[in-house]
From Swiss-Prot:
Top enzyme class: lyase
Interval spanned by the transit peptide: 1-27
Encoding gene per record: ACO2
Organism, scientific name: Homo sapiens (Human)
Lineage: Eukaryota, Metazoa, Chordata, Craniata, Vertebrata
GO molecular function, one term: aconitate hydratase activity
NCBIfam families per record: aconitase_mito, PRK07229.1
Protein's recorded name: Aconitate hydratase, mitochondrial
Extent of Basic and acidic residues compositional bias: 528-537
Pathway the protein takes part in: Carbohydrate metabolism; tricarboxylic acid cycle; isocitrate from oxaloacetate: step 2/2
Length: 780
């Protein structure tokens, strides 16, 4: 391999030199660091301003806030083609964040790139591998023991390549980012679909797969299809039991799980000022559930207040100077506009099984009775990256305190997940944690826990029909506890707390009464709590590891016999031929999320070992042939068996295969394992009615063909026993459909067209076998 300096020169020549943001204007102002942890990495609003002005002159129209931040980070603002929903933008993100479940594969890919240091500030956050069993400290100790090999790999890889490392117990990635790294106008990418949480602090924060993160860490311009912009105008003000969570629950009901695909959701209007900064983060966080690229709020005094309280008053002061670039222009155009009067917004609860099935809390009991959903609530769970702020915990404690005053405790089991060590320490100091314990709650570790399926649930048997209510973001079938009969509903933390006290979905805290131990009836008053502590936050324990200045002696070891970690082998290049006689591994019926494609929960321990985790490929998807999960016909033996076993059989016998999917295939998590696994086991194409954004990109990155039916009705022409030939790959060009020949067992054939969204760069990924392979080609 060529020397590192030569490789970098070649990469820069081929892909564009990273613009290090220095301008004479900045010299006249005090430099402000991006974070306390990176004192030599500065915020460069001057370059943002310069790029915005270039684009504004070109487009000659008012700009949305989303456009200002995105176009302000263009690699070449003077010549970049800009057309919403069509052109691919080459961007220069400010930083990268990775959680431990996705960081393993991202760092393994970065190691494979041959580069010696990350080109932008980057961090790893240990939050996904801690299973909830009995409570915080014990669960954390157990996780450190079980996951020692993975934590050691991530810590040493971070030290070797210049990546900050947040140790297990530090908190959930998105809360840590909000407290320390997000700021107005930042462009941040994260290997988690809820990265948009940072939009609550006025940043464009986008969830991506690990391969995208590798590009940015390598200093390569990052590609994003120019997003459309959906405006949500907020009027009135929140009050009573209505909360920020109800805004996004309402929006999800309007837009559905795919209504935001390819768009940034931009909140604006006079109602914004009635929402706290962390409340805005809640709304942006759950924007992932409508398929949005990200969501964002304009910079205002609530953000300034939060920045100051988290020790970043210097950033707030700098943002004040550039505020015109951190809010939308008057008269800017939105591709779609939704208006919500916050004064009329009622508390909502969404579910079960999908986050866009919205109900007012006042009506969900009647709907549940009609649908036959279990009314009794077995467990109420508050916290998660969506709702674990100081204000969230305070409002829940305010509800709990009223019940305790009347001698009541929860009828349901009740758990609390602090979002970070800082939140945990502060709610302990200020008494909120004890109030919630007194109600019957168990405080879990500062981690994702049950929200992502890390829950060793003991109170039910698998297959037992039951209801849980959470303040989380997703409620897909089996997501929280691997039980397909758990009816999970998402709502605000204070509503979860009230429902856990009552123990039933039929309870409406706005109108219904509870009976105290003295026999007297009382009604819960709407909770009120401070959005931020009156004093300073308590930082708690120090859980951050700085990368050393000199990492030349740092080693990163991956044992060849490890069951948790595995160095990556490059995928084969395209052989230059059309794809002939592809076997159909599975024709999926209905919803197929990344949880269905690559389950989390007990499988998280294999996130760094591609071959082992591939044993969960599509085990949650429903086979249209028999209506069952993880049961497909082997076309050779004609026997039904698990999906991964069948895929391995095909791979062993040189049979290439394809998956047929329905609408919004791959919605949910950003996990790129859902793309790596089919590629590893011999898949060549995924053909669907439509894709979720992140998953479609992840498939392209790994050399697969994500294709969509030109006519969605053609989905019905394909049967699981057919074979498919995909033609036109020799002339594979942007915008030109590919031809698919369907070969039926009776000898008849049909020809259909398949669309794609590949651009020239992405076609090169396919030809090279993967984006990582293409990166290596450019180094030679």
């Amino acid at each position: 391999m060529a020397p590192y300096s030569l490789l970098v020169t070649r990469l820069q020549k081929a892909l564009g030199v990273r613009q290090y943001h220095v301008a004479s204007v900045l010299c006249q102002r005090a430099k402000v660091a991006m974070s306390h942890f990176e004192p030599n990495e500065y915020i460069h609003y001057d370059l943002l301003e310069k790029n915005i002005n270039i684009v504004r002159k070109r487009l000659n129209r008012p700009l949305t806030l989303s456009e200002k931040i995105v176009y302000g980070h263009l690699d070449d603002p003077a010549s970049q083609e800009i057309e919403r929903g069509k052109s691919y933008l080459r961007l220069r993100p400010d930083r990268v964040a990775m959680q431990d479940a996705t960081a393993q594969m991202a760092m393994l890919q970065f190691i494979s790139s041959g580069l010696s240091k990350v080109a932008v500030p980057s961090t790893i956050h240990c939050d996904h591998l801690i299973e909830a069993q009995v409570g915080g400290e014990k669960d954390l100790r157990r996780a450190k023991d079980i996951n020692q090999e993975v934590y050691n790999f991530l810590a040493t890889a971070g030290a070797k390549y210049g990546v900050g490392f947040w140790k297990p117990g530090s908190g959930i990635i998105h809360q840590i980012i909000l407290e320390n790294y997000a700021y107005p106008g930042v462009l941040l990418i994260g290997t988690d679909s809820h990265t948009p949480n940072g939009g609550g602090l006025g940043g464009i924060c986008i969830g991506v797969g690990g391969a995208d993160a590798v590009d940015v860490m390598a200093g390569i311009p990052w590609e994003l299809k120019c997003p459309k912009v959906i405006g949500v105008k907020l009027t009135g003000s929140l009050s009573g039991w209505s909360s920020p969570k109800d805004v996004i629950l309402k929006v999800a009901g309007i837009l559905t799980v795919k209504g935001g695909t390819g768009a940034i959701v931009e909140y604006h209007g006079p109602g914004v000022d009635s929402i706290s900064c962390t409340g805005m983060a809640t709304i942006c966080n759950m924007g992932a559930e409508i398929g949005a690229t990200t969501s964002v709020f304009p910079y205002n005094h609530r953000m300034k207040k939060y920045l100051s309280k988290t020790g970043r008053e210097d950033i707030a002061n700098l943002a004040d100077e550039f505020k015109d670039h951190l809010v939308p222009d008057p008269g800017c155009h939105y591709d779609q506009l939704i208006e919500i009067n916050l004064s009329e917004l009622k508390p909502h609860i969404n579910g079960p099984f999908t986050p866009d099935l919205a109900h007012p809390v006042a009506e969900v009991g009647k709907v549940a009775e009609k649908e036959g959903w279990p009314l009794d609530i077995r467990v109420g769970l508050i916290g998660s990256c969506t709702n674990s702020s100081y204000e969230d915990m305070g409002r829940s404690a305010a509800v709990a305190k009223q019940a305790l005053a009347h001698g009541l405790k929860c009828k349901s089991q009740f758990t609390i997940t602090p979002g970070s060590e800082q939140i945990r320490a502060t709610i302990e100091r200020d008494g909120y944690a004890q109030i919630l314990r007194d109600l019957g709650g168990i405080v879990l570790a500062n981690a994702c826990g049950p929200c992502i399926g890390q829950w060793d649930r003991k109170d039910i048997k698998k297959g037992e029909k039951n209801t849980i209510v959470t303040s989380y973001n997703r409620n897909f079938t089996g997501r929280n506890d691997a039980n397909p009969e758990t009816h999970a509903f998402v709502t605000s933390p204070e509503i979860v707390t009230a429902l856990a006290i009552a123990g039933t979905l039929k309870f409406n805290p706005e109108t219904d009464y509870l009976t105290g131990t003295d026999g007297k009836k009382f009604r819960l008053e709407a909770p009120d709590a401070d959005e931020l502590p009156k004093g300073e936050f308590d930082p708690g324990q120090d859980t951050y590891q700085h990368p050393p200045k000199d990492s030349s002696g740092q080693h990163v070891d991956v044992s060849p016999t490890s069951q948790r970690l595995q160095l990556l082998e490059p995928f084969d290049k395209w052989d230059g031929k059309d794809l002939e006689d592809l076997q159909i591994l599975i024709k999926v019926k209905g919803k197929c999320t990344t949880d269905h494609i690559s389950a989390a929960g007990p499988w998280l321990k294999f996130r760094g070992h591609l071959d082992n985790i591939s044993n969960n490929l599509l085990i949650g998807a429903i086979n249209i042939e028999n209506g069952k999960a993880n049961s497909v016909r082997n076309a050779v033996t004609q026997e039904f068996g698990p999906v991964p076993d069948t895929a391995r059989y095909y791979k062993k016998h040189g049979i290439r295969w394809v998956v047929i999917g329905d609408e919004n295939y791959g919605e949910g998590s950003s996990r790129e394992h859902a793309a790596l696994e089919p590629r590893h086991l011999g898949g060549r194409a995924i053909i669907t009615k439509s894709f979720a954004r992140i998953h479609e990109t992840n498939l392209k990155k790994q050399g697969l063909l994500p294709l969509t039916f030109a006519d969605p009705a053609d989905y019905n022409k394909i049967h699981p026993v057919d074979k498919l030939t995909i033609q036109g790959l020799k002339d594979f060009t942007p915008g030109k459909p590919l031809k698919c020949i369907i070969k039926h067992p009776n000898g008849t054939q049909e020809t259909i067209l398949l669309n794609h969204t590949f651009n020239e760069t992405q076609i090169e990924w396919f030809r090279a076998g993967s984006a990582l392979n293409r990166m290596k080609e450019l180094q030679q």
